Amino acid sequence: AIMTTVSGTNIREIPDIIDLVVAQKVDIFAFGRYCPTSFEKSTHIEPLEYRDFLERIWQKFEQYKDCGTTFNLKDHLWTLFLYEKGLFRIPDATDADTIYDGCHCGDCHMTILPTGGVMACRRFDSPVGNLFREHIHHIYNGEKMNAYRQYEKFKKCSRCELLRFCRGCPAVAYGYTHDFFAADPQCWKEINQNYE
């Protein structure tokens, strides 16, 4: 399997990487977006540029759909992309209080470090406890982890019909703004602009 990171620095190289992955008969390919650790400008991708990128990558995936490589749609903005194309539909029988997919931070994953430290997400500094001092059950159900489950606090996503299925990447948003609940900087969906 091969996974790569996409940023403004290498976005134009990804289609060639896909060609190489297929030529080398790699079994799985995926990519994730770069999470800046400061307010870097050189790596930024504009929202519509990212949407156009996903369109080009989707066409590549379709071109190679029978090649034997599984293309993992890891980035949660694929949900928005597929929704706009009519390839993802919100199921009729869904519970308004249930998170079905999208970012799993605080929901169904955590990162355990060799020091025993537990992070809500591996992609940004999000300490929620330490296994050497607390039981994992208490960490998972604790106040610090619950802070990441406040879906109504998402400044843009909380008003989007895809809230329970997407939420973009809050770690990327955090890398740009130091606010976990800020709008995903590559999300192109137009929502009432008064979300800040």
Language-model features: where?
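Flexible mid-to-C-terminal extensions adjoining Fe-S/redox cofactors in radical SAM and related proteins
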Residues: 118, 122-196
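Radical SAM enzyme [4Fe-4S]-AdoMet core and its adjacent flexible, acidic
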Residues: 1-106, 111-123, 127
